[in-house]
Design a protein with these regions (language model features):
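A structural boundary/capping signal
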Residues: 1-215
């Protein structure tokens, strides 16, 4: 089954979503992705971003976009790890799988009543941070979370970490989109419409079950 998702569809919920719904959406997106992949969704940030963006767009009628680029991961106690593909790799890669180090997440721009434009950021992969730390041989003492959901202007690098070598190249940013990476991510999305459509449908069914069971 293919699900075609556009931002003009009649919304089911208002965006930005109430914070009380965040863990519910996180759970159904994770279950959908993990059931369709291996290792509980580990190393599948692209799938989380694409399925999550399509699902949120379907729910709200607002355009949520999967984006890809670099990330500085915070493992706690000042242990930071940089995920970033080299410029040469970004220029020569013809498929997302050819990017050695990258991260994917979701963004949406919202215009508030006072005219302010803010960027909402959603990342359903924080549940795997401790596993990443173990894989690269670094200790993990950070906060155990399953997702990040908020605003870019509220998710800033603390002053005490801004001089860390991890931020030397891109400045004090936890995540930064890269055009080439995002283009490859969107190509991957177009390449497998039925695959992602099934996961979005699964997430919608899981959400309906949640509402029915707890309504």
């Amino acid at each position: 089954m293919r699900v075609t998702v556009t931002a003009s569809q009649t919304p089911i919920l208002n965006a930005p979503l109430d914070r009380a719904l965040h863990p519910v959406i996180d759970e159904v997106v994770h279950r959908s992705v993990s059931e369709a992949t291996t290792k509980d969704g580990y190393m599948r940030c692209a799938d989380y971003a694409i399925v999550g963006a399509q699902f949120l767009t379907l729910l709200t009628g607002v355009r949520y976009r999967p984006v890809a680029g670099g990330e500085v991961m915070d493992f706690g106690d000042g242990n930071l790890y940089v995920l970033c593909s080299t410029r040469e790799r970004r220029r020569t890669a013809t498929h997302l799988s050819q990017l050695a180090r990258y991260h994917c997440w979701i963004e949406a721009r919202h215009t508030h009543a006072d005219g302010r434009v803010r960027t909402e950021i959603v990342d359903f992969t924080l549940r795997h941070d401790a596993t990443v730390a173990a894989a690269v041989g670094m200790p993990f003492s950070g906060v155990q979370r399953t997702y990040l959901w908020g605003w870019t202007d509220e998710h800033e690098v603390p002053a005490e970490l801004r001089d860390h070598p991890a931020f030397a190249k891109q400045g004090p940013h936890w995540r930064w989109p890269e055009r080439e990476c995002t283009e490859l991510l969107r190509a991957y999305e177009r390449e497998r419409p039925n695959y992602f459509g099934r996961q979005v449908s699964r997430a919608m069914n899981l959400l309906a079950d949640q509402i029915e069971n707890h309504g």
